[in-house]
């Protein structure tokens, strides 16, 4: 029996091969198969955001002005979430709410669902782009894995959280001041800053910033002075084969500073990857918990003692009072459709009053 070894070659290219050749061609801006998802979705998400912040009011959904046309600036303009009465409707332009009327669609908050969904798929497309290019140039896919952190946060905050609540209304609107309002809402209604998942997220993000600063400074401190140039940027050939800084010197330095130091570059750089990505993922998991209205830490014994003893107060009990204030003041302002009216006696006051 004869076994023929060799690569099977087709006589003529089919449509897939033709598209593959064109999409993955070496050009100034790589397109790739991921580009079929990334570029249209990113274009529509950004275009929808610029359109909404420029022209579209939030009067019908939040009772607010939210566009440049109404007098907002870059910090106060936003693409606002749909009204609470629309629940979790996808708000398709041709759906039963807008019925093909573009103006009405914008008034109802259709641009928010448009931007949120296209934005989510654009982020996923960008991660797939990193996978695709890494595979093409034979790199490992850790860039794409790292980018899963921001995707997890976006999806949990903008999609999963409102899905767990009564509607898209409770998601963040796409704007700077709108995000700040959402943060205050999270604190007042969920005590988010005392949530351990938020603590891990803060530790991850700030820890990553510290690691970046330390790493950059250490590399700059231990550069080999073997170039002719006068400064860092002129002294080295970008194609040189040898390393540009001394890991041994850096190790000795930090061993003296802390008593411990990274002994190899692989562990060092993996740690720099692990800290922020894990922090972002933990924060995203915490937001999923909030979508289900899971409580954070409750130190009930301190609350009971503070209620019984006017002279006993902790930073925790002070924060609980602040949260009650946020809820009492924000609920009426933020959910005008509920017609909430709080009598004076239920508004929170300090223990001393």
Curated annotation (Swiss-Prot):
Phosphothreonine sites (modified residues): 2
GO molecular function: chlorophyll binding; electron transporter, transferring electrons within the cyclic electron transport pathway of photosynthesis activity; iron ion binding; oxygen evolving activity
Pfam families: Photo_RC
Residues the entry annotates as binding chlorophyll a ChlzD2: 118
Main localization of the protein described in the UniProt heading: plastid
Enzyme class: oxidoreductase
GO CC annotations, alphabetized: chloroplast thylakoid membrane; photosystem II
Cofactor note: The D1/D2 heterodimer binds P680, chlorophylls that are the primary electron donor of PSII, and subsequent electron acceptors. It shares a non-heme iron and each subunit binds pheophytin, quinone, additional chlorophylls, carotenoids and lipids. There is also a Cl(-1) ion associated with D1 and D2, which is required for oxygen evolution. The PSII complex binds additional chlorophylls, carotenoids and specific lipids.
Binding positions (pheophytin a): 130, 143
Binding site for Fe cation: 215, 269
Transmembrane segments: 41-61, 125-141, 153-166, 208-228, 279-295
Intracellular or extracellular location(s): Plastid, Chloroplast thylakoid membrane
EC number, as in UniProt: 1.10.3.9
Protein residues bound to a plastoquinone: 215, 262
GO biological process: photosynthetic electron transport in photosystem II
General remark: 2 of the reaction center chlorophylls (ChlD1 and ChlD2) are entirely coordinated by water.
Record function comment: Photosystem II (PSII) is a light-driven water:plastoquinone oxidoreductase that uses light energy to abstract electrons from H(2)O, generating O(2) and a proton gradient subsequently used for ATP formation. It consists of a core antenna complex that captures photons, and an electron transfer chain that converts photonic excitation into a charge separation. The D1/D2 (PsbA/PsbD) reaction center heterodimer binds P680, the primary electron donor of PSII as well as several subsequent electron acceptors. D2 is needed for assembly of a stable PSII complex.
Protein name: Photosystem II D2 protein
Species the sequence originates in: Oenothera argillicola
């Amino acid at each position: 029996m004869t076994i023929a070894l060799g690569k099977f070659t087709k006589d003529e290219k089919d449509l897939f091969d033709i598209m593959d050749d064109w999409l993955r061609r070496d050009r100034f801006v790589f397109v790739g198969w991921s580009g079929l998802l990334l570029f249209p979705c990113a274009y529509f998400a950004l275009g929808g955001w610029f359109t909404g912040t420029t022209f579209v009011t939030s009067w019908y959904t939040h009772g607010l002005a939210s566009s440049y046309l109404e007098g907002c600036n870059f910090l106060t303009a936003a693409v606002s979430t749909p009204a609470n009465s629309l629940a979790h409707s996808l708000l398709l332009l041709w759906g039963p709410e807008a019925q093909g009327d573009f103006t009405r669609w914008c008034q109802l908050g259709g641009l928010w669902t448009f931007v949120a969904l296209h934005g989510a798929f654009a982020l996923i497309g960008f991660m797939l782009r990193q996978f695709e290019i890494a595979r093409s140039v034979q790199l490992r896919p850790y860039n794409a894995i790292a980018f899963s952190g921001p995707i997890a946060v976006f999806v949990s905050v903008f999609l999963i959280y409102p899905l767990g609540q009564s509607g898209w209304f409770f998601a963040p609107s796409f704007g700077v001041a709108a995000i700040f309002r959402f943060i205050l809402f999270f604190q007042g209604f969920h005590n988010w800053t005392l949530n351990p998942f938020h603590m891990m997220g803060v530790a991850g993000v700030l820890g990553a910033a510290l690691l970046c600063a330390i790493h950059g400074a250490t590399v700059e401190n231990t550069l080999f002075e073997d170039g002719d140039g006068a400064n860092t940027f002129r002294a080295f050939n970008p194609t040189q084969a040898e390393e540009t800084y001394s890991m041994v010197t850096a190790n000795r330095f930090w061993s003296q500073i802390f008593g411990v130091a990274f002994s190899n570059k692989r562990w060092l750089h993996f740690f720099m990857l692990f800290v922020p990505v894990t922090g972002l993922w933990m924060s995203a998991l915490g937001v999923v918990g909030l979508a289900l209205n899971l409580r954070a830490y409750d130190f009930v014994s301190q609350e009971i003692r503070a209620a019984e003893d006017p002279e006993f107060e902790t930073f925790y009990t002070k924060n609980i009072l602040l949260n009650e204030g946020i809820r009492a003041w924000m609920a009426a302002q933020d959910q005008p459709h509920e017609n909430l009216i709080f009598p004076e006696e239920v508004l929170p006051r300090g223990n001393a009053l």
